[in-house]
């Protein structure tokens, strides 16, 4: 854990080795494979030590995206010092300033710890503290891109103000769409983001 809000996890798959980067940074939260090396602090942070304890010899059983939200869950299975199977979810929430990385015990549903501890003084609806039950971020009421049809798309983005600001309308209307992704979608659709009603939208 080279900084307070980012992690590197080494993954072994047969003879292959992968390095997974996780970030809960406000400006560049994300998850991706990398070959980047980084200098680590002399004394590992507490969250890093906890992950080493629970994940160092664990097997990855599943990696999934929650619905079409920007939430990724890495489900693991390990054996503790008593020989019992222990299952965890490493949850990466990619949500701008609300981004977080949490380790949750699957059986109890409780948070073992997280990279950003949020108390009730900061967020009354949702606290992320060790020992509390994990509560998923509230739904934003957006339409899933898995459920999109041309009719639903036109209705959703029109209601979200596509004519005034296409990029913001896509982000507001469709779950899992970031501002960068919205800009790329518009560019690929029309070759430009300047036309507020692209040919693809009118069609």
PLM regions with names:
Residues 1-19:
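N-terminal-proximal low-complexity accessory segments that begin disordered
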